[in-house]
Every structure is written in structure tokens, then in C-alpha cells.
Amino acid sequence: MQFKILVVGKLRNEFIKAGVNEYLKRLLPFINIKIEFLPSFSELPEKMALLKEEEIILKNIKNNEFIIILDKNGEKLSSEEFSNKLFKLTTLNPQITFVIGGIYGVSENIKKSSKFLLSLSPMTFTHEFALLILLEQIYRAFKINRNEPYHY
């Protein structure tokens, strides 16, 4: 089982970098997560930016990967439901790849190529916060799955 997270944009906020590093460290006993930061084209008009980002995202996805797109219109799951779904998926798919889009999200083609759209919240988050929240929820999912203290 391997997780990869593709993130359009860089981490700029030091406190988020610290949080991301903390959760990556906490996750090491369970899984090694690879995070790839992809260039953002936010300075371009929306359609052009989405097309350029789509091209780069698709270059970083392999055919055997189960793709989960983070999208505010995706399925909304409780932490327990996310844990159950994640561990069911990993029994069938050794490679899970999460995609966090840039300021415009991801293109419709990327959404259509994914197997699952996941919403972290009805609210919109920056790519940085989305990454941190996703890592925390993955960590929580492992703790729930193992019946270990953390989730209350």
C-alpha cells in the first residue's frame, strides 16, 4: 500500500509546513506518503490555468493508481466513513493518489478520470490547508482502523 498526494502549488506558510511535517512523521509507522508539489498557473486566466495544470497532473499519474480528487462538491464523509472507505480501497488498490488542485480546483477532465471525488468540507480551503487537513484525516483513519486512542 502506497499513498501519493499531488498538490498544485507550493507550501509557503511556515506553520502549515510544520504541521505537514508533523503528520508525515506521525504517519511513518503506518505508511510512507509521497507528496509532489506541481507548478501552479494561477497567474493565467482560469481556463488556461486549468488546462496547463491538467497536463502536469496527468503526467504524474500512472494507470494503476486509484485517483481521489479533493473537490468541494465531492462526497462528504465523516472521519469514520473516510477510514472505512480508505481501508476498503487499499485492499483492492495498492496505489492511492490524492489530487489537490490549485486556486481554480481541477479541470473537468481530471474529475472524470478520477475514481472518487472527496470533499473535506462544504467550505473552500487553500491547497496548503487542504493538504494539512488531508494528512490529519489520513492519520486519524489509521488510528480509527487500529482502534488506537486519538479519535474521540
Curated annotation (Swiss-Prot):
<keyword id="KW-0698">rRNA processing</keyword>
<keyword id="KW-0963">Cytoplasm</keyword>
<feature type="binding site">
    <location>
        <position position="101"/>
    </location>
    <ligand>
        <name>S-adenosyl-L-methionine</name>
    </ligand>
</feature>
<dbReference type="InterPro" id="IPR029026">
    <property type="entry name" value="tRNA_m1G_MTases_N"/>
</dbReference>
<dbReference type="GO" id="GO:0005737">
    <property type="term" value="C:cytoplasm"/>
</dbReference>
<keyword id="KW-0489">Methyltransferase</keyword>
<keyword id="KW-0808">Transferase</keyword>
<comment type="function">
    <text>Specifically methylates the pseudouridine at position 1915 (m3Psi1915) in 23S rRNA.</text>
</comment>
<dbReference type="Pfam" id="PF02590">
    <property type="entry name" value="SPOUT_MTase"/>
</dbReference>
<comment type="similarity">
    <text>Belongs to the RNA methyltransferase RlmH family.</text>
</comment>
<feature type="binding site">
    <location>
        <begin position="120"/>
        <end position="125"/>
    </location>
    <ligand>
        <name>S-adenosyl-L-methionine</name>
    </ligand>
</feature>
<comment type="subunit">
    <text>Homodimer.</text>
</comment>
<dbReference type="GO" id="GO:0070038">
    <property type="term" value="F:rRNA (pseudouridine-N3-)-methyltransferase activity"/>
</dbReference>
<dbReference type="InterPro" id="IPR029028">
    <property type="entry name" value="Alpha/beta_knot_MTases"/>
</dbReference>
<keyword id="KW-0949">S-adenosyl-L-methionine</keyword>
<protein>
    <recommendedName>
        <fullName>Ribosomal RNA large subunit methyltransferase H</fullName>
        <ecNumber>2.1.1.177</ecNumber>
    </recommendedName>
</protein>
<dbReference type="InterPro" id="IPR003742">
    <property type="entry name" value="RlmH-like"/>
</dbReference>
<feature type="binding site">
    <location>
        <position position="70"/>
    </location>
    <ligand>
        <name>S-adenosyl-L-methionine</name>
    </ligand>
</feature>
